[in-house]
Amino acid sequence: MSDVSGGESSSHKRNVDSAANENDDMQNKRQKTEELGGHDDQLNDIFNDPLPGFGGSESNSTPYNDNAQEGELGPENFDATLPKEGDPLDIDFDNLPTNFLEAEQATNANNGSQVDTPSGPGSVPNMSVTTNSASMSASPNNTPRPTPLSKTNSRSETPVGNSSRATYDGTNLKQEFGINGLSNKQEALNRYSQMPPTNRMNHLAPQPQGIQGLNTSSIDRIPSTSTSNKEQLHTNDPSKLNDALAAAGVDIQHEEELLMQQHLNRSSRFPSAQQPPRQRFAQTSLFSPYHVAAFMQRVARENGVMQNFYQDAELLELMSTSCENWLSNIITKTIILSRHRRRGIPTITNTKQNKKTASSSASMSNPASRSELSKELRNLAAKQKEMEERRVSKRMALGLEKDGTDPGNGDPANGKAGAEETLHRAANATAAMMTMNPGRKKYSWMTANAGSGGGDDSKVASEKDGKSKQSSIIAARGDNGLRFREIRSGNSVTMKDLLGALEDERMGTEKAVLKGYAKLKD
């Protein structure tokens, strides 16, 4: 009996102690709530369901009965205190209980939006506030309610691609709205009752989504203890947003400058169609810059100079211009030597006879079409012809040679020879006429040789000569008169002219002159 009575007394003592502890807890809670200026029933309105910390466990907790005494619970107004689904939350931050904040500090909150099941009296569910309404913690009647996280991290940074946002710490909430008081209550209520501004700079980034009656935009303004101010991710300042191009190392301003420079270079390289052709020709160099640079680099390497000439455009242009001037000088000298070769140096005299002969020769022939050399050769041939006629005349006077046109000549052998010669000339004239131009008009002098003999030949020769009458003896020998003769290469520049111009150069022409004389045929 003593054991039974002892057990009953111990159990009764434990019940009394637990009841005393519960009464002490209730008195402490009411005292702290009165310090904040609120009542216990306002805490039920905040979270839309009864809290196990005020009524024991969550299953048997009931709201306060207004008709009963303070601290007693009644089931009359249990359903009336629960808000309907969809009603906005009315949070009074001035009258928050401190026991809720102290209990949360001792609880290890999970990262995310899950609700911890209360394990006993006085336990507080752990929830996290996020911007996505689908990931918020909910009460048994599917009504969202915010729950602060742990004390350690007052703000957690998330990447741009993640849909979750930074969470708010209950410690900061206590410091801002707790015992120390609030300097500007209306400003805090406005911050937590408006939607956060959207990110207009990056449309791909997830836009913040607030819950009913709660705004988390000011959470980003709270400085983080783990990161410095320079490394913070500013989501509300468009000028400080981390752009994807800047994160990749792309400088937009530098790229624009390069693009503008390329456009200017392209416009200077390819002039417009409205530009005059002379200016465009002046800008074009004689040689290709690539070939000039390759040649200069090869010669410089042979002399021990290592330099890249491809990048120096001004040097290449200067070298091309100098080569053009040097070639122009060589070609000018070559043309001068060609003229001197074809035309002799005229004699400069002040005599009237020379002036008359010069004027008469200029009127008879075009000096531009016939060279002085051809004229001198023709004069020499005319003098030789006159000498030959005088010699033949002397032989005929001495009887050493007979005239072929004499009609009294009755030698049959001579007559037969004359007939054969006449037929031969006629055949040659016919063949020449057929081969050269068979369809042209026939003149009398073309067929006069076949019937008349050497007398007509002298007439034709005299017409061609124009100066002196040709002898019949010379005409019988087949001489049709003198003509002007021009050299085939007389009006062009030859290898001799070019070699003469290169020999005048002092440096850099030795090898070229040797190769030229080796290729010279005549």
Curated annotation (Swiss-Prot):
The alphabetized list of GO BP terms reads: transcription initiation at RNA polymerase II promoter
- Domain named Histone-fold is located at 293-379
- For bias type Polar residues, the affected ranges are 57-68, 105-117, 125-172, 209-237
Where is this protein chiefly located?
A: nucleus
Task: List all Basic and acidic residues biased stretches.
Answer: 26-42, 456-468
Location(s), subcellular: Nucleus
Q: Where is the composition biased (Low complexity)?
A: 358-371
Q: Which GO terms describe its cellular component?
A: transcription factor TFIID complex
Q: Which Pfam families match?
A: TAF4 (PF05236)
The reply on keyword Transcription is yes
Q: Which keywords fit this entry according to its UniProt record?
A: Coiled coil, Nucleus, Transcription, Transcription regulation
Q: Is the keyword Coiled coil assigned to this protein?
A: yes
InterPro entries the record matches: TAF4 (IPR045144), TAF4_C (IPR007900)
Q: Name one GO molecular function term.
A: DNA binding
Positions of the UniProt region annotated as Disordered: 1-172, 194-237, 346-375, 398-420, 448-479
Question: What sections of the sequence does the record tag as coiled-coil?
Answer: 8-37, 368-395
What does the annotation say about its assembly with partners? The 1.2 MDa TFIID complex is composed of TATA binding protein (TBP) and the 14 TBP-associated factors.
Q: What does this protein do?
A: Functions as a component of the DNA-binding general transcription factor complex TFIID. Binding of TFIID to a promoter (with or without TATA element) is the initial step in pre-initiation complex (PIC) formation. TFIID plays a key role in the regulation of gene expression by RNA polymerase II through different activities such as transcription activator interaction, core promoter recognition and selectivity, TFIIA and TFIIB interaction, chromatin modification (histone acetylation by TAF1), facilitation of DNA opening and initiation of transcription.
Q: Which family does it belong to?
A: Belongs to the TAF4 family.
Know the name of this protein? Transcription initiation factor TFIID subunit 4
Give the species this sequence originates from: Debaryomyces hansenii (strain ATCC 36239 / CBS 767 / BCRC 21394 / JCM 1990 / NBRC 0083 / IGC 2968)
Q: Which gene encodes it?
A: TAF4
